[in-house]
């Protein structure tokens, strides 16, 4: 299976979770690891939830991808959801540096965001408004497709990305930095 189809299958599996449990939480981090050769050669990957871990601040939700005849998972996907807080927190924006190697990442249309929600079954209202937030999984999928030879991606989200924002990214020597309008949206460590 190609990386596009695998990320879509994981996104669809995520929508099977009891969303009411995680209402108001937001994605802080995503880690995706694959046994690249095995995952690409597979005709079908079966996704299962791993053991959910929780503390006072977050949920850690694993999804494991299995191929028939192979004992260990060929993919491991972990999403860290940050629990909502009773305290009002002001968003601390992180200014993007000036990058000589900056290039366009993507400008997601509202229709792309709505379409991704429809295709995966995601009914989170923040992705369905007039000014929708771009799904973390959609950002992950776009980065994975744009990057050759991916076996691991770790994404840390800094602030929401919105439809119609001209997203740029640049390599800072360690991570790819996703930014728009002078502010960091996320960082991607890709191996």
Residue ranges and their predicted role:
Residues 1-39, 123-125, 131-152:
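Active-site helix/loop of acyl-thioester processing domains in fatty-acid/polyketide metabolism
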Residues 2-9, 21-105, 163, 172-191:
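HotDog/MaoC-like acyl-thioester-processing domains
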Residues 11, 15-19, 93, 101, ...:
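Sparse, context-dependent recognition of short Cys/His-centered cofactor- or disulfide-binding micro-motifs
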Residues 110-181:
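Acidic/His-leaning functional-site neighborhoods
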């Amino acid at each position: 299976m190609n990386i596009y189809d695998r990320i879509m299958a994981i996104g669809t599996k995520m929508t099977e979770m009891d969303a009411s449990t995680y209402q108001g939480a937001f994605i802080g981090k995503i880690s995706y690891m694959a046994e690249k050769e095995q995952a690409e050669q597979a005709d079908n990957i079966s996704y299962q939830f791993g053991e959910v871990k929780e503390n006072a601040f977050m949920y850690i939700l694993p999804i494991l991808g299995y191929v028939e005849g192979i004992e260990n998972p060929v993919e491991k996907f972990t999403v860290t959801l940050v629990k909502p807080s009773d305290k009002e927190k002001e968003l601390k924006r992180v200014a993007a540096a000036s990058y000589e190697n900056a290039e366009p990442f993507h400008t997601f249309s509202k229709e792309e965001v709505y379409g991704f929600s429809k295709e995966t079954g995601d009914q989170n209202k923040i992705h369905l408004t007039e000014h929708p937030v771009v799904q973390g999984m959609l950002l992950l999928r776009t980065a994975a497709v744009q990057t050759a030879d991916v076996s691991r991606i770790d994404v840390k989200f800094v602030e929401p990305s919105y439809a119609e924002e001209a997203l740029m990214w640049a390599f800072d020597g360690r991570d790819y930095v996703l930014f728009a309008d002078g502010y960091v949206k996320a960082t991607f460590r890709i191996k």
